[in-house]
Amino acid sequence: MISSTTGQEMTSREMLGYYLNKSYADAAAAKERGELICWSSSIAPNEFCEAMGIHVIYPENHAAAVAAKGGALDLLEVAEKKGYSIDLCSYARINLAYMDVQNCVAENIPLPDFVIVCNNICNTLLKWYENICTTLHIPMILIDVPFNYEDEISERSLDYIADQFVNAIRQMEEITGKKFDYDKFDKAMEISRESVYWWTTAMGKASALPSPLNG
């Protein structure tokens, strides 16, 4: 991809910034058109939203962008004045404060019509997203992932999560008022599988000496 400012091929970092800003701009335009916006935790089945034509925003990423641009402190103070403890995750506090002020040093994002959260990352997420829903009076779709004590995943756990996926699709159909598009879902899954392959391949290069990756 060619940069509009330099006229040269974009670096991977520049492309990442371009597509991130584009996703926020596309979501804002969609909100103005009356389309649905979903706030999602970083590891949740966003392929469901893609199948339903729902625009997805990741509050954790947005909070990190705010902090990277030096805007965290102002929002953290807003959150603390609202009664959120300083012991809470700063991502959560930044996002919960942003809901009030709806303005920040990073790209502004539209408020959600519903949220989808998967609790396989941290315990904070569940209460964070419950607060979003309570404040905005919107529905929450929860994917509850059981803790895995062994290397192998049990059939019981797989069945449990699969049942929740079925319920999540049913909830999305109720929220959107339309049927789930399985053709679009298959296409989204195809892209996801390819992305996983290339991500795994890229991460595998870290074993080389010298390593092309740091951190």
Where is each model-derived feature located?
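Acidic/His-rich segments in extracytoplasmic proteins that coordinate ligands and/or metal ions
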Residues: 96-170
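Residues at alpha-helix termini
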Residues: 51, 134-135, 174
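Low-complexity, flexible helical/coil segments
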Residues: 72-78, 92-97, 149-157, 174-181
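Short glycine/serine/threonine/alanine-rich loop segments
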Residues: 54, 138, 178
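A structural signal for short, well-ordered beta-strand segments and their strand-loop junctions
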Residues: 38-40, 56-59, 115-117, 139-144, ...
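A charged, amphipathic alpha-helical module
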Residues: 1-36, 162-215
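An N-terminal, globular interaction/scaffold subdomain
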Residues: 39-108, 113, 120-121, 128-129
